Swiss-Prot record:
Composed of three domains: a modulating N-terminal domain, a DNA-binding domain and a C-terminal ligand-binding domain. Liver. Residues 534-573 are annotated as: Disordered. Residues 534-552, 559-573 have a biased composition (Low complexity). GO terms for cellular component: nucleus. It holds the Pfam family Hormone_recep. The lineage of its organism: Eukaryota, Metazoa, Chordata, Craniata, Vertebrata. It is found in: Nucleus. This is Estrogen receptor beta. A zinc finger (NR C4-type) spans 171-191, 207-231. Residues 15-170 are annotated as: Modulating. Binds estrogens with an affinity similar to that of ER-alpha, and activates expression of reporter genes containing estrogen response elements (ERE) in an estrogen-dependent manner. Its main location: nucleus. Residues 171-236 bind DNA.
């Protein structure tokens, strides 16, 4: 980066600073980085402007492209970019490679995908050739990344400021940015500290109102009783494992090695193209050029193998033993589901945050559909695995699960009536995964729109494959349309069933009936967080029906008597 002696670098003028103000705020962390605070020599402020040479004014380098390089694999050369962990940390989102000691948070699935390739920068780039970070530098980065909370509420609003957009988590209590996974849920520093004080000390809080106070980012301090009640409602547990006090990254690195290595070889071609822009488009071209028959064969090949509980079952079941068996199987299936999704043609071409988000939102629907497919030839039974086959009445030992069993059996019976074929099953499973409504955001940039367009194209391809599968049965056009409609309508039933199952799992977690496994627990919390954020966004938007009612005051028109509306009853409220 050093220029030739003959070329003078342009000068940048620094703003004149009053020395008195510097002395007053010298200990503020807002002026100096944390690791240099108080360690720099005193600066003598004079009355004239200070100018420094700027190596950046004539550079045409696009710094936005650098945000996808990670500090653990880059070495920075030259004085243009200081060799400080703070500088490296600000240029690397934790979505792909979380920095050591980082207080941002990785989505439950982000670490399951392999890190994309990194390519050499152009000659004019100030960055050196990528190479592994030395151990000493990693330790320095870890120390520099640790930020102390200034107060209970002060840092919770900025806990996720370094996290990528697709990597952001919110507090389950107040919906502020979450600083980590604490006491069983994602929470900010403020709510974590409040819950800790409440369970360790005095907690005889009394609500001055009706025990229904709104707890959000701005009003979380208004009522301690309602805040503690909401902490318990979202699943905070007194007996939460002490490891949950650490950041999400620290907990994830203690997971079993085979789960961290599930990513295989597909890290997402989108992230590779961002590094240089010259990555071959072979994989994307192949995925878009597949015929319906080839696409179905690829999806069938991606199907995961059968899993076994591999535990001795004692009957009759108890609530604990059944929930332990079901959650154990679900956790094993989630591990295989990640590999399955990455083998769907075109899935790894999506933005990494979209891949993670899709899996977080549809995982229970995929599990439910798989359960129905295994049980379709066994009327009255649910085949969770070859060594765990349950009758309907065996679910009575678990509170609330009998209703879910009945709904699963009803949907399975409908699939049996339709004589569901394997090709149709795998297409429906892929359609559940590729739901584009799960990736909508309020503000979409060009990259997000590009990823969404790819997702829509993939969904069209899978839908065409499903239509082709139905058409080859020799049915008439009317029969084909009717069968397609019946199959797609069952997806809405599966979504409703998934919501019921998610609610039941959340209740089991709050009651501490059975300890959930790591991956299952993270997926459950991620889905719950997405649902709460979506419901909050919907509630903030006025309904068109309410607007119409406000624009037309007065009693609503009475029914003519021909509609199925129930008769009105006088209200005594």
């Amino acid at each position: 980066m050093a220029g030739s002696p003959g070329n003078e670098l342009p000068l940048l003028q620094l703003q004149e600073v009053d020395s008195s103000k510097v002395g007053e705020s010298g200990g503020s962390s807002g002026l100096l980085p944390t690791m240099y605070n108080g360690a720099l020599p005193a600066l003598s402020m004079e009355s004239h402007a200070v100018c420094i040479p700027s190596p950046y004014t004539d550079s045409s380098h696009d710094y936005a492209a650098l945000t996808f390089y990670s500090p653990p694999i880059l070495s920075h050369g030259g004085p243009a970019v200081p060799e400080s962990p703070a500088a490296r940390q600000s240029l690397s989102p934790s979505l792909f490679w979380p920095a050591h000691g980082h207080h941002g948070h990785v989505s439950p699935l982000a670490l399951h995908f392999q890190q994309p390739l990194v390519y050499r920068e152009p000659a004019h780039s100030p960055w050196a050739e990528p190479k592994p970070l030395e151990h000493g530098q990693a330790q320095t980065s870890k120390l520099a990344g640790k930020r102390m909370a200034e107060s209970e509420e002060g840092t919770s609003s900025v806990g996720g400021c370094f996290a990528g957009k697709g990597d952001m988590h919110f507090c389950a209590v107040c919906h502020d940015y979450a600083s980590g996974y604490h006491y069983g849920v994602w929470s900010c520093e403020g709510c974590k500290a409040f819950f800790k004080r409440s369970i360790q000390g005095h907690n005889g809080y009394i609500c001055p109102a009706t025990n229904q106070c709104t707890i959000d980012k701005n009003r979380r301090k208004s009522c301690q009783a309602c805040r503690l009640r909401k902490c318990y409602e979202v699943g905070m547990m007194k007996c939460g494992v002490r490891r949950e006090r650490c950041t999400y990254r620290g907990a994830r690195h203690r997971r079993m090695p085979h789960i961290r290595e599930l990513a295989g070889t597909g890290g997402g071609a989108r992230t590779q193209r961002r590094g240089e822009g010259v990555v071959p488009q072979t994989q994307e071209a192949q995925s878009s050029a597949l015929t319906p028959e080839q696409l179905i064969n690829r999806i069938i090949e991606a199907e995961p193998p059968e899993i076994y509980l591999m535990k001795e079952l004692k009957k009759p079941f108890t609530e604990d033993s059944m929930m332990m068996s079901l959650t154990n199987l679900a956790d094993k299936e989630l591990v295989l589901m990640i590999s399955w999704a990455k083998k769907i043609p075109g899935f790894v071409e999506l933005d990494l945050s979209d891949q993670v988000h899709l899996l977080e939102c549809c995982w229970l629907e995929v599990l439910m559909l798989g359960l129905m497919w295994r049980s379709v030839d066994h009327p009255g039974k649910l085949i969770f695995s070859p060594d765990l086959k349950l009758n309907r009445d065996e679910g009575s030992c678990v509170e609330g699960i009998l209703e879910i069993f009945d709904m699963v059996l009803a949907a399975t019976s409908r699939f049996r009536e339709l004589k569901l074929q394997r090709e149709e099953y795998v297409c429906l499973k892929a359609i559940i995964l590729l739901n584009p409504n799960l990736c909508t955001t309020s503000s979409e940039n060009r990259e997000e729109l590009e990823s969404r367009n790819k997702l829509l194209h993939m969904l069209d391809s899978v839908t065409d494959a499903l239509v082709w599968t139905i058409a080859k049965k020799g049915l008439t056009f009317q029969q084909q349309s009717a069968r397609l409609a019946h199959l797609l309508m069952l997806l809405a039933h599966i979504r409703h069933l998934s919501n019921k199952g998610m609610e039941h799992l959340s209740n089991m977690k709050r009651k501490n009936v059975v300890p959930l496994y790591d991956l299952l627990l993270e997926m459950l919390d991620a889905n719950t967080m997405h649902s709460s954020r979506m419901s909050a966004s919907y509630s903030s938007q006025p309904s068109p029906w309410s607007q119409a009612a406000q624009s037309q005051p007065g009693p609503p028109p009475s029914c003519s008597g021909e509609c199925p509306c129930p008769p009105k009853e006088s209200s005594t409220i």
